[in-house]
């Protein structure tokens, strides 16, 4: 079913993400590296000179405060983040940034999301055999003829089980609950805020729930067994959404009339 969905719905192209902004992290390279490595859940040492990486920050209890994509542009790191989370990101990290003489600067660059052929992965932060997801950053207006809409861009993320939190969902989930342990967290890099709890839940916790992508017919009505997280996408006669589901309910739910697949 997954391959069929890819073939029917995935569309290559670019989408201007009007509600995302770019925050430059300023300071000496060594200090910026130390600061980011001690705060972000991902390992910035794994980013190449022009690379992108899914990341996030947590509070001391291991709850995700906000998520974003970090980009390395030579010696400069850029945080690409929803505009409603940018101030939260800066406010949360400002007390720690002062110890490293690090500053944050919101710039005027434009963010463009890309759904690309899998052979074109140099701009990507996620890839499989069918397609890649990436970003482009422009100083001025961009002009391309391969534009896609928001749903077409978000579709690739839903199928990849990549979630972007909004303001109402901050500090509600730990990484293991929303697939961030697989996509936005490094368990080899060392300490960051909330790291001990995140690692404990990963290695010692019992997985009673699963973060899933649910594909249903348009008329399907969600009940209390399916906790929808994020935006629901509507494509023709189907719906695609992210959800947290009890493992004990999965077999029952996938057999319901109107459920096409649970990934």
Describe the predicted segments one by one.
Residues 1-263:
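Basic, glycine/lysine-rich polyanion-binding surfaces/domains
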């Amino acid at each position: 079913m997954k391959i069929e969905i890819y073939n029917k719905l995935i569309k290559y192209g670019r989408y201007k993400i009007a509600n995302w902004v770019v925050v430059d992290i300023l300071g000496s390279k060594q200090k910026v590296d130390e600061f980011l490595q001690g705060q972000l859940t991902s390992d910035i040492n794994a980013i190449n000179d022009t690379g992108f990486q899914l990341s996030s920050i947590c509070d001391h209890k291991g709850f995700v405060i906000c998520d974003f994509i970090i980009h390395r542009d030579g010696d400069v790191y850029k945080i690409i983040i929803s505009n409603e989370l940018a101030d939260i990101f800066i406010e949360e990290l400002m007390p720690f940034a002062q110890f490293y003489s690090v500053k944050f600067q919101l710039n005027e660059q434009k963010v463009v999301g890309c759904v690309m052929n899998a052979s074109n992965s140099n701009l990507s932060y996620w890839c499989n055999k069918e397609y890649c997801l990436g970003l482009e950053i422009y100083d001025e207006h961009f002009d391309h003829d391969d534009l896609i809409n928001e749903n077409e861009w978000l579709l690739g993320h839903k199928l990849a089980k990549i979630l972007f939190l909004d303001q109402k969902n901050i500090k509600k989930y730990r990484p293991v609950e929303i697939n961030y342990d697989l996509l936005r967290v490094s368990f080899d890099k060392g300490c960051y805020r909330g790291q001990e709890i995140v690692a404990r839940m990963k290695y010692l916790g019992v997985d009673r729930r699963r973060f899933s992508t649910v594909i249903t017919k348009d008329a399907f009505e969600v009940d209390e067994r399916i906790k929808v997280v994020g935006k629901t996408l509507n494509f023709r006669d189907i719906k695609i959404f992210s959800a947290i589901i009890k493992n004990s309910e999965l077999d029952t739910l996938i057999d319901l009339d109107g459920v096409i697949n649970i990934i």
